[in-house]
From Swiss-Prot:
GO cellular component terms attached to this protein's record: cytoplasm; cytoskeleton; plasma membrane
Further facts: 'Furca' means two-pronged fork in Latin.
Family under the similarity heading: Belongs to the IQD family.
Annotated region (Calmodulin-binding), positions in chain: 214-231
Region (Disordered): 93-140, 332-398
A Pfam family: IQ
Disruption-associated phenotype: Reduced trichome branch number.
Sequence ranges of Polar residues compositional bias: 379-392
Residues annotated as domain IQ: 163-191, 192-214
Protein name (database record): Protein IQ-DOMAIN 19
Single Gene Ontology MF annotation: calmodulin binding
Length: 446
């Protein structure tokens, strides 16, 4: 049943007093008893509606007891004590009370919001614990914030810095391209140089091998020709002709020596002297000793080697006797040196002393030649002239092939010219002829 206005005011006053004393909202639970005993169930809720405090109380039970307790106020203390004990009990044992059937004039909890739960505490109760800290935020929003910050920083970068960074990157790429290009060109150049050098080296090696082969073949041919010349002298017709001419020349020289000896033996029978004086036997002997010594000097190793070089190198090569190839012939300078070393320089001192002694003897024995018959001397001179004229044709051929013979004739004729003899004309003819042959021989040498 709904209370009237005076009852509402009384209830309001009671609620205000309770709030002032304990500052809590009293919640009185009901106890249902069986049979006829019932208690009063009071549910109170404090709500702020239109700026004022509205206290609603629904009283169920017997009205008589309620009015008595309300008017008399005897049992207020006992009720307060019961309420405090029940509040402590409920606070110590938290739990959800079982829902029971009760009479209520308010809206159900399903339709309306639940009433606020007010904690009933005592004055001596400890303060409530502090609230727990809030949970940490998730990582995903943090990452998003970092990305957002970077984007903001990039946006804040000036346009000049972006252009500079792009230019540096382009330059780096272009320089790397140029470096690769230069490296490829250098590799190609090195390969080309290696190919060219290898070709040149191979070409030079082949040229040297060909030259060596040509030299070896030339040396072999030269050796074969030398062996043939050494072993085939007897079969060569020209060498046989030269040998016969040399033998004839030596035989003629021996005959001339014999004629001179016969004239010397017949000079004892000449009564009167003549203008054409002859040589003494000592002069002749000294003259022929000089010739023999000259021959021995020519047969010495040095002179023989030079004669051999001259004979083999010049005469035989000029008359188709190639002991040496054409490229090994003597030059003009070497021939001039050989010509400068002529026979008078090569004459040994002993021969020169013998010639001087022979001249002195001839000068001392010149008066003795006056006793030689004039006819014999003339005959000998005429015989010498005839023999010389007969020999010219043969000696010409000999001097063409053997110019060294002119040197011997020249020396022998000079010694005869210096001696006192009657055949001066023959001596002069022989010397002139020897000089003429010597000049021809030297011309043939060149």
């Amino acid at each position: 049943m709904v209370l009237g206005c005076p009852k509402r005011e009384a209830v309001k006053e009671f609620g205000v007093q309770c709030l002032k004393q304990e500052n809590v909202c009293p919640i009185i639970t009901s106890r249902n008893q069986t049979h006829t005993h019932t208690h009063i169930t009071i549910s109170s809720s404090l709500t702020l509606h239109n700026g004022g405090l509205s206290l609603q109380k629904i009283i169920m039970g017997k009205t008589s007891k309620w009015f008595r307790s309300l008017l008399t106020g005897k049992k207020e203390r006992t009720k307060e004590h019961i309420i405090q004990s029940e509040c402590v009990f409920t606070s110590s044992i938290p739990g959800t009370p079982k829902e029971k059937r009760r009479w209520s004039f308010r809206r159900s909890s399903a339709t309306g919001p639940p009433p606020p739960a007010c904690a009933i505490t005592l004055k001596d109760s400890p303060p409530p614990p502090p609230p727990p800290p809030p949970p940490p935020p998730l990582q995903q929003p943090f990452v998003v914030e970092i990305v957002d910050n970077e984007d903001e920083q990039i946006k804040n970068v000036s346009a000049e810095e972006i252009e500079e960074f792009a230019a540096i990157k382009i330059q780096a790429c272009y320089r790397s391209h140029l470096a690769r290009k230069a490296l490829r060109a250098l590799k190609g150049l090195v390969k080309l140089q290696a190919l060219v050098r290898g070709h040149l080296v191979r070409k030079q090696a082949t040229a040297t091998l060909r030259c060596m082969q040509a030299l070896i073949t030339l040396q072999a041919k030269a050796r074969e020709q030398r062996i043939r010349m050494i072993g085939g002298d007897s079969t060569n017709p020209r060498t046989s002709i030269h040998k016969t001419r040399i033998n004839n020349f030596y035989h003629e020289n021996e005959e001339n020596i014999k004629i001179v000896e016969m004239d010397i033996q017949s000079k004892m029978y000449s009564p009167a002297p003549s203008a054409l004086t002859e040589m003494s036997p000592r002069a002749y002997s000294s003259h022929f000793e000089d010739c023999n010594s000259f021959n021995t000097a020519q047969s010495s190793p040095q002179c023989f080697s030079r004669f051999k070089e001259y004979y083999n190198g010049d005469t035989l090569s000029s008359y188709d006797y190639p002991l040496f190839p054409n490229y090994m012939a003597n030059t003009q300078s070497s021939k001039a040196k050989a010509r400068s070393q002529s026979a008078p320089k090569q004459r040994p001192p002993e021969i020169y002393e013998k010639q001087m002694s022979g001249r002195r003897r001839s000068s001392m024995e010149a008066p003795r030649n006056n006793g030689v018959p004039r006819a014999v001397r003339m005959q000998r001179s005429s015989s010498q002239l005839g023999s010389n004229t007969a020999k010219e044709s043969q000696q010409h051929h000999h001097h063409q092939y053997y110019p060294w013979m002119a040197i011997k004739l020249d020396r022998s004729n000079i010694s005869l010219m210096e001696s006192e003899c009657g055949s001066t004309s023959t001596v002069m003819t022989n010397t002139n002829y020897g000089r003429h042959v010597d000049v021809q021989g030297n011309n043939n040498m060149y």
